């Protein structure tokens, strides 16, 4: 039935005032529920979400992927960071809403990818508020290989154009940046071959930025090195998926 419709089934069976949605690859800290309860007692909350982190037991590749998926430099802060280039949209790996909001929006659509962002957009379009609960974090297990990670992020790039077709106003500048990265890297590589090798400095400086930032956060040289690879994979895969979807739906007008 897909992730969205499966969540709908569970939500329709639930009897509480609030609904929580978590991915099956997430680990919930002991204080997670208490943090959410306290937030709901403090103020009226329609829908909310929290960030994701890497557990100390995760592999080096998973920690590196966690860096690339959460860093401001690779995502613009849209995945639960306080500093962000886009309004916060709760995502279903760590998301909650009142039963009233769920029933009003009729839950998740049967989309293969991006169904959680679609629901968050519809929640806000209906006039409800969403908020980030920074302390309501989960430990999110990442893909175990870079190959699987590439496929995941490529699908996310494709999904962003599908979301644009449903919600034209949802496409922001930050969503174009991975495509700009892909085109920029190709230009630098071509220029280094035909003009001057110094054009590779731009790519090298970006790699150095990812390395030093990950080293600062993870305190591990191996994770920092893998974070550079993960970050380049993420930006490339998302950018290619985004460009591919633009070509399919914008130029070829596929349905």
Q: What kind of feature is each model-predicted range?
A:
Residues 54, 77-100, 112, 118, ...:
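A recurrent flexible, glycine/aromatic-enriched loop bordering the glycosyltransferase active site
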Residues 3, 7, 32, 93-94, ...:
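Conserved donor sugar-nucleotide recognition element shared by glycan-biosynthetic enzymes
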Residues 181-252:
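Membrane-embedded multi-pass helical conduit in multi-pass membrane proteins
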Residues 23-27:
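The conserved acidic donor/metal-binding loop of glycosyltransferases
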Residues 19:
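Short aromatic/hydrophobic "clamp" motif used to bind/position activated sugar donors
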Residues 109-171:
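Catalytic donor/gating beta->alpha subdomain of glycosyltransferases that bind UDP-sugars
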Residues 1-14, 35, 85, 89-93:
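Glycine-rich, basic loop-to-helix element that forms the pyrophosphate-binding segment
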Residues 30-63, 136-137, 141:
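Conserved donor NDP-sugar-binding/catalytic core segment of glycosyltransferases
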